[in-house]
Amino acid sequence: MGVQHKLDIFLVSEGIAIKEANLLKGDSYGCTIKIKLDKEKTFKFVIVLEPEWIDEIKPIYMKVNDESVELELDYKDAIKRIYSAEVVLCSDSVINLFSDVDVSYTCEYPTIKVNTIKKYYSVQNRGMTYVHIESPINTKDKCWFVEKNGWYEDRTHS
């Protein structure tokens, strides 16, 4: 079977969990998220990476409309890394979360569509993954966060 890291992306502001956004084989992970909106909105992302091994993990990069966004490392232990980012979007946007930016990998990552106007989301292209979407975010996944002022905040350090 080979190496396989697990990547889940939580679009907390929309109550959407993008599960298993990792390639079926190898240590690459990521996805493209296409967001449609009609007004300015703040989006909170929480990215949970569960690596098969911890010696060396590829960093994950986030780009919003081709502009780099820094991810905060909120939590790190032997079996899990949790990153977060908050972005303000004013128009339809494309978000890329990738560990590898080479086209031989990016063409295999899934594409997710999120329409905030119609409250609709779908997997446009699965790529070489078992990606699926859950909404609302389930209680087990929420255990990594605690709701505070409408956002989920990391509580793993307490």
UniProtKB/Swiss-Prot annotation:
Q: What Pfam families does the database record attribute to this sequence?
A: Pox_C7_F8A
Give the UniProt keywords, A-Z. Answer: Early protein
Q: Does the keyword tRNA-binding apply?
A: no
Instruction: Give the top-rank taxon of the lineage listed in the UniProt record for this protein.
Output: Viruses
The answer, when asked if Ligase is one of the entry's keywords, is no
Q: Which GO terms describe its biological process?
A: viral process
UniProt cross-references to InterPro entries, sorted A to Z: Poxvirus_C7/F8A
Family to which the UniProt record says this protein belongs: Belongs to the poxviridae C7 protein family.
Q: What does this protein do?
A: Plays a role for multiplication of the virus in different cell types.
Q: Please state what the protein is called.
A: Probable host range protein 2-1
What is the native source organism of this protein? Myxoma virus (strain Lausanne) (MYXV)
